[in-house]
């Protein structure tokens, strides 16, 4: 028996040697060069360096330098430890093929063993590289006894200064807020000082647009972050990409929950370097969709309609809503305020003032007018006041167990968690789930098609423990609860509209508000456009981005919003993705809220602009043109200039948030369009034709907006594209909504259109001859247009499935 065991052991050692390169106490670096990436483990410094390579294999840029990966854990005896790559005596590299949601590629694993603290643990860092992708992934794990626990793993942890970019005041680091509560803002900080961004960030040169994008693609367990200490507007002193963040901005009062061993692994982290950081952010969103596809269950078109909270708030009533519904049906919708399917949504918020019978009557009346009705819920909030009787019974299990408030509430440091005026409920608790299941079933039976879900971030605050004993982190608890709720809604095809909510996980909602509590003044428009300035790319995570209720004429100081402010707020909705206006249009309402006569007057001027409504019907968010020109010079200020490109038009929206005229010129090369690519430029609010010669001239009055539409030559593009001969390029469907494009000559750009000529995706190639495309949002026949380096182009038709 012993002889047979020895032979088996020898075979295992031989097979391992084929894949593993051991390094023990020596000064040789371990180098991985694969595609556009070069990863070097510098043995003498016990640290990683990551370089981006040019097509020929020469180093283009060092994007991460001197990264000493960090793991914090409790060992088998419960002693808190911290180890880095420098803590281990041995390191070995292994290589294996992988084939997962990102496609076929290679995984390079660095295993660190024999830590100086004497624990029987190993640390493993994996790098995943896929041909044709402009990014790689990396994660970090700590492995040992089943009793180990970890709540902090940093696959990237730079602790020494290096220059990422030449010093320039246009260089920026993007801050992404964890949620949309507390009037938090996106930020584009100059590269000097400390910044923390949640789940993703970009460090980029504003003027060249080159940028490094870092972030997490797994959102079922961890809260992750990117933090940096920067200097000289281009240098990195510290840079950490890690799982296990807990701050006041994540709404946590206690540390991140600890994940159980014997193997604890961070989220996979996206590392990508792009010629245009905006493309990088969009690519990051698409990468997330490969892991967890977004919810795309809504088939009734871009949401246009009315929202009850914005002006009426809690002084709503059945009679008022019926009158407003009639006004939409009789006046606004026939004149063009609706989506391209002719649909309208009436979203009834908290305090709608209706009984169940009135709800049924209202829904039935709306159905006759081709209007759908939405309702309101707060799935994880316990509205009990601050001093409830914790022994109150909320529900009873099938076995007779009674669930009290104390059983259901989340606790931190033994005390119930109070947030945003309510106590937070455990998303894993059977009562929380059953209450929402009953609510959804009942609302659907009434005829509601749309549910606004508010304060859902109450379910993602770290607690001491959860009803489900296997759950130890806030994100895992939230994911369990939201997955259950989403499955209930999918039974009935209902729209989930998240209001106050975290950005990640995203896959449970059809829409999410980009910024909350936004009314109608120019200051409110600027606040909302700040979220588009830094977060436009989130429309790839949600079927629609929501600009919040669009108020034209509101209450108090909002009664006197100027017509320019009205245009700006309305356009804010159109360049975001949804159009739920919230004015009080009822002439017979006696609540004292709003000014119905003025609202109807403004509606005729603003809400019936056919061209703006056609633009809004796309349901897409516009990109910032610059990315570093904040309107007021502050890091959290909105930008003025935004753009969106499809095959028929290029739209450029210019917002003026200030009390004086805004005028100037935008070079066409910044808009990615040449002078011979369009036949006219029209401003959509004044209907003025604009003369363009190398630059787009703009002039925007105080507190107003202008939208410039370039009409591209070639009409919609579909006919022209189908007539172009595809003779050099081969496009192969790979399944999984992926295409491989092979070419006999250098390609500069690939564009993918649907059969109606709508642009669905682009990829800049910089002279490559092959590229794999991921199209997570596309299904069906596609037209693929290839732009070659020599200026020619051609198209082929293919199936995406």
Predicted regions and their residues:
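Beta-strand-rich recognition/accessory modules
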Residues: 31-33, 194-300, 700
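Substrate-binding cleft of carbohydrate-active enzyme catalytic domains
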Residues: 301-463, 477, 484-490, 496
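C-terminal beta-strand-rich structural cap/linker in extracellular carbohydrate-active enzymes
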Residues: 692-715
């Amino acid at each position: 028996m012993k002889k047979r065991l020895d032979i088996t052991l020898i075979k295992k050692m031989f097979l391992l040697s084929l894949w593993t390169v051991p390094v023990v106490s020596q000064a040789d670096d371990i180098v991985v060069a694969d595609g556009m990436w070069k990863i070097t483990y510098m043995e003498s410094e016990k640290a990683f360096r990551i370089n981006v390579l040019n097509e020929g294999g020469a180093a283009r840029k060092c994007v991460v330098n001197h990264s000493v990966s960090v793991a914090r854990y409790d060992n088998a005896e419960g002693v808190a430890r911290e180890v880095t790559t420098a803590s281990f005596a041995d390191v070995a590299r292994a290589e294996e093929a992988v084939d997962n949601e990102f496609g076929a590629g290679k995984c390079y694993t660095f295993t660190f063993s024999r830590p100086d603290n004497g624990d029987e643990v190993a640390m493993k860092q994996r790098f995943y590289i896929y041909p044709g992708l402009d990014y790689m992934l990396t994660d970090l794990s700590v492995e040992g006894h089943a009793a180990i626990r970890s709540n902090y793993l940093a696959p990237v942890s730079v602790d020494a200064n290096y220059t990422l970019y030449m010093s320039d005041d246009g260089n920026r680091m993007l801050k992404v807020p964890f949620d949309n509560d507390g009037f938090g803002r996106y930020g584009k900080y100059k590269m000097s000082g400390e910044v923390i961004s949640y789940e993703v960030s970009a460090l980029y040169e504003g003027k060249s647009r080159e940028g490094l994008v870092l972030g997490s693609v797994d959102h079922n367990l961890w809260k992750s972050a990117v933090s940096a200490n920067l200097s000289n507007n281009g240098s990195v002193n510290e840079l950490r990409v890690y799982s296990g963040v807990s701050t006041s901005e994540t709404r946590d009062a206690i540390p991140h929950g600890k994940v159980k061993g014997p193997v604890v692994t961070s989220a996979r982290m996206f590392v990508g370097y792009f010629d245009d950081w905006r493309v990088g952010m969009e690519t990051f969103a698409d990468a997330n969709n490969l892991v967890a596809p977004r919810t795309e269950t809504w088939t009734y078109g871009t949401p246009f309609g009315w929202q009850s909270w914005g002006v009426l708030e809690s002084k709503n009533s059945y009679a008022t809503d019926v009158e407003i519904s009639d006004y939409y049906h009789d006046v606004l919708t026939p004149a063009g305020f609706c989506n391209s399917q002719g649909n309208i949504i009436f979203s009834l918020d908290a305090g709608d003032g209706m009984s169940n019978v009135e709800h049924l009557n209202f829904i039935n009346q709306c159905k006759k007018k081709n209007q759908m009705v939405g309702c309101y819920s707060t799935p994880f909030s316990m509205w009990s006041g601050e001093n409830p009787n914790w022994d109150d019974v909320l529900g009873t299990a099938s076995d007779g167990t009674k669930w009290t408030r104390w059983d259901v509430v989340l606790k931190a440091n033994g005390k119930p968690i109070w947030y945003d005026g309510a106590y937070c409920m455990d998303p894993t608790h059977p009562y929380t789930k059953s209450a929402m299941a009953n609510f959804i079933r009942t609302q659907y039976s009434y005829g509601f098609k749309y549910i606004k879900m508010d304060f859902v971030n109450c379910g993602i605050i770290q607690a001491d423990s959860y009803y489900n004993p296997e759950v130890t982190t806030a994100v895992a608890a939230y994911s369990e609860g939201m997955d259950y709720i989403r499955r209930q809604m999918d039974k009935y095809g209902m729209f989930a509209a998240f209001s106050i909510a975290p950005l990640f996980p995203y896959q449970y909602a059809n829409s999410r508000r980009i910024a909350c509590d936004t009314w109608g003044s120019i200051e409110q428009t600027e606040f909302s456009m700040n979220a588009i300035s830094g977060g436009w790319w989130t429309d790839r995570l949600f079927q629609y981005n929501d600009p919040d209720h669009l108020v034209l004429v509101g209450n108090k100081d909002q009664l006197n919003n100027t017509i320019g402010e009205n245009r700006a707020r309305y356009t804010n909705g159109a360049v975001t993705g949804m159009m739920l206006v919230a004015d009080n249009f009822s002439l017979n309402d006696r609540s004292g809220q709003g000014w119905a006569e003025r609202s109807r007057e403004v509606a005729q001027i603003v809400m019936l602009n056919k061209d703006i409504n056609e633009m809004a019907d796309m349901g897409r968010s516009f990109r910032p043109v610059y990315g570093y020109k904040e309107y007021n010079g502050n890091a959290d200020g909105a930008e003025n200039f935004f753009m969106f490109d499809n095959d028929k038009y290029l739209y450029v929206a210019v917002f003026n948030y200030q009390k004086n005229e805004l005028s100037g010129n935008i070079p066409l090369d910044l808009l990615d369009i040449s002078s011979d690519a369009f036949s006219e430029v029209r401003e959509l609010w004044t209907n003025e034709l604009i003369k363009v010669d190398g630059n787009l001239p703009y002039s925007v009055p105080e507190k107003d907006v202008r939208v410039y539409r370039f009409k591209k030559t070639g009409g919609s593009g579909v006919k022209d594209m189908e007539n172009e001969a595809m003779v050099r390029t081969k496009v192969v469907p790979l399944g999984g909504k992926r295409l491989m494009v092979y070419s006999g000559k250098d390609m500069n750009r690939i564009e993918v259109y649907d059969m109606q000529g709508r642009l669905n995706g682009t990829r800049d190639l910089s002279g490559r001859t092959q590229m794999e495309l991921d199209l997570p949002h596309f299904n069906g026949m596609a037209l693929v247009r290839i732009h070659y380096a020599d200026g020619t182009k051609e198209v082929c038709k293919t199936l995406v499935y």
